[in-house]
């Protein structure tokens, strides 16, 4: 069994960048390698139909692969969604749900919600949760024009809170434009982080996410970088 035991978070520069697919792939790889890995979604909005924890669980073939905090119907940032839906969500409860997942024997994987500055609950943002849970991060970003600014600012926001960024995944990478072809090198120079690229995946069913991520990302290398958290 590969010796990868570190808890970590998969966060994004924005919504829709591919955090859930990357999370499913990494958790699936860990479980296939013999680890009792579990993803936790701090809160879910746009529910139904959106249910990222259910996607990860289905992709990994077991409900034990994922859990979720409060689910809210409006497709908005959690704190805003709760206000619109006239519901109450509690940051302490969300934190405790995530901390419980990290306290398990196997690796815990926090999946972010939208980007880092998304309002979560009680005036706290996603980046605050990641910082207070004290976990290293894998940052998922878009591949094309504009990602240099968004990604570098996200890395800066994490580092300001002493969060280790172990690597960047540029998702939906096709290399068809000059921006795509140069972004990986430039981002490595700007941030000092290793940058990985992942092409568009054909996902007809959730299980395809695990196979696709494992095929196109150097998963063991990505996860090994999480183990080298210099902040510890």
Swiss-Prot record:
CDD domains hit by this protein: DTBS
Pathway note: Cofactor biosynthesis; biotin biosynthesis; biotin from 7,8-diaminononanoate: step 1/2
Binding annotation for Mg(2+): 20, 52, 111
Coiled coil: none
The protein's Enzyme Commission number: 6.3.3.3
Residues that coordinate or bind ATP: 16-21, 52, 111-114, 171-172, 200-202, 207
Superkingdom as given in the UniProt entry: Archaea
Chief location category: cytoplasm
Oligomer status and interactors: Homodimer.
Function: Catalyzes a mechanistically unusual reaction, the ATP-dependent insertion of CO2 between the N7 and N8 nitrogen atoms of 7,8-diaminopelargonic acid (DAPA, also called 7,8-diammoniononanoate) to form a ureido ring. This archaea does not encode bioA (which catalyzes the formation of the precursor for this reaction in the cannonical pathway), instead it encodes bioU, which replaces bioA and also performs the first half of the cannonical BioD reaction. Thus in this archaea BioD has a different substrate.
Family statement: Belongs to the dethiobiotin synthetase family.
HAMAP family: BioD (MF_00336)
Full protein name: ATP-dependent dethiobiotin synthetase BioD
Organism: Haloferax mediterranei (strain ATCC 33500 / DSM 1411 / JCM 8866 / NBRC 14739 / NCIMB 2177 / R-4) (Halobacterium mediterranei)
Lineage of origin: Archaea, Methanobacteriati, Methanobacteriota, Stenosarchaea group, Halobacteria
